[in-house]
Amino acid sequence: MAIALVATYSVTRKSGLDALDACRTSKIMGGSAAIGGPFTLMDENGRLVTDAEVLAKPALVYFGYTYCPDVCPTDAARNAEAVDVLEEQGYEVTPVFISVDANRDTPPVLKEWTDFMHPRMIGLTGTPDQLKAVAQAYKTLYQVPENPVDDTYLVDHMTQTFLMLPGTGFAEIFSHDDSADRVAEKTACFLEATTASN
């Protein structure tokens, strides 16, 4: 069983409300701009892509690995279900899966896994240094065993899903316990607020 690292996020509030504040339940200390940033990674088709390409539309971004026995497939399936619920409401949201297991999650492995989860899910991988950098940008933690005895090792990792919006960046964090309906409802709130503010 994969062990999820536990992190506590401090809840903060600005003195003035922006158009998205009514939808937010939490923020990262330092503000929402503290989450995310530029990256270049390899997608499941073996193509180098940037954050600008991957996050050109609203996205649910999750860090995990395909060999994860329980948490990752559960969360990825939940995110995929939320994306389908949102699509029924007229919203296009991209499910993104960033692997933190550079050794095993090659593009072909990622492609098979993400295609099974959702036809529009984007799988990303990179070198250990690239993955470490993007994980740090998203304030997420993981730990790959340094010298595994075989290919059956587990990777400890956090289980948050990040809602990223074009032109806004980080909007919200969803936990492992949030249902697909909850993720869809909160995401729709942000998308409606973004549309109303434009």
Language model: regions and residue ranges:
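N-terminal targeting signals for export/organelle localization
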Residues: 1-38, 190-193, 198
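Short, small/polar residue-rich loop motifs at catalytic or cofactor-binding pockets
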Residues: 34-36, 58, 156-158
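A short beta-strand-turn-helix
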Residues: 39-59, 83
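Short acidic-hydrophobic, aromatic-tinged amphipathic segments that line or gate anion-handling sites
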Residues: 42, 122-126, 143
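Short active-site neighborhood of thiol/selenol oxidoreductases, capturing the structured segment around
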Residues: 51-75, 79
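Hydrophobic beta-strand anchors of alpha/beta hydrolase catalytic cores
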Residues: 60-61, 95, 161
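Structural microenvironment flanking redox-active thiols in thiol-disulfide oxidoreductases
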Residues: 74-134
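Thiol/disulfide oxidoreductase modules built on the thioredoxin-like
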Residues: 130-186
